[in-house]
Amino acid sequence: MGVTNFFGEAWRTGKSIVTGLGITFREMMFRPAITVFYPEQRDDVPPWFRGIPVLKTDLRTGEYKCTSCMQCAQACPVNVITIEWHQDPETKKKVCDRFAIDMSRCMLCNFCVEACPFDSLVMGYDYELCKVNPENLVFEFEDLLRLGLKYSKAEEPGPKATRSSTPPWVFHGLTNATEDDIQDIHGYLGRPPLPKGYEPELKPQFRKPAEEAAEAQQAEAAGQPAAEPGKTNGEEAGQP
């Protein structure tokens, strides 16, 4: 009985070894290699990768796009952005003296990029941020501009902000937004177009002002004086 168990165990052991070696040989000879020999080889990062935030430059003028508006520093949830600036006495514009990001505490949340109104920040693809000295993880203005050159381009001079170039919601409120205005807003936000004839549903606090504005427009079209706010034309004339 003991001899039988010995040969049985030996057979199962040999079979498992041969099976394992067969899998290893098949993976080695007939499957593509997935090992990356870093740092000689590097995989491409996906487009949505978030690396160190860097500053972009207008390659047409050679000037950096940052205006020191402080929006990114205010949006940062961990306060890793430091901005120092002074005002040019001639142009009255802000001039950036220092723009630093402490990458030892940055959480790569992308809030600074989303908050920037001038598209001067971008999340770069640089991921090799290991440093021996933690103080070297503070990237200064020149470092961020140098790293951001690969993401910069020559900007065409655009027109000044006008009624047509500014997002529609800046000029149109809920009470006077037309159907075309609402469609423009949805197109600006990348949303699908609304069905034809769509009308916005006003909140209760906006309904009465909207009704009064509509009555005033109708009265003006009919050649009648507009009623005072809170009164209809009938109440103004003394009718019950």
UniProtKB/Swiss-Prot annotation:
Keywords, alphabetical: 4Fe-4S, Cell membrane, Iron, Iron-sulfur, Membrane, Metal-binding, NAD, Quinone, Repeat, Translocase, Ubiquinone
Location(s), subcellular: Cell membrane
InterPro entries referenced in this protein's UniProt entry, alphabetically: 4Fe4S_Fe-S-bd, 4Fe4S_Fe_S_CS, NADH_quinone_OxRdtase_chainI
GO function terms (MF aspect): 4 iron, 4 sulfur cluster binding; iron ion binding; NADH:ubiquinone reductase (non-electrogenic) activity; quinone binding
Cofactor(s) demanded: [4Fe-4S] cluster
SUPFAM superfamilies (alphabetical): 4Fe-4S ferredoxins (SSF54862)
Predominant cellular place of this UniProt entry's protein: membrane
Entry GO CC: plasma membrane
4Fe-4S ferredoxin-type domain segment(s): 57-86, 97-126
Compositionally skewed regions (Basic and acidic residues) per UniProt: 198-211
UniProt biased composition (Low complexity): 215-230
Top-tier EC class: translocase
Protein family per UniProt: Belongs to the complex I 23 kDa subunit family.
Function: NDH-1 shuttles electrons from NADH, via FMN and iron-sulfur (Fe-S) centers, to quinones in the respiratory chain. The immediate electron acceptor for the enzyme in this species is believed to be ubiquinone. Couples the redox reaction to proton translocation (for every two electrons transferred, four hydrogen ions are translocated across the cytoplasmic membrane), and thus conserves the redox energy in a proton gradient.
Quaternary structure annotation from Swiss-Prot or TrEMBL: NDH-1 is composed of 14 different subunits. Subunits NuoA, H, J, K, L, M, N constitute the membrane sector of the complex.
Name of the protein described by the UniProt record: NADH-quinone oxidoreductase subunit I 2
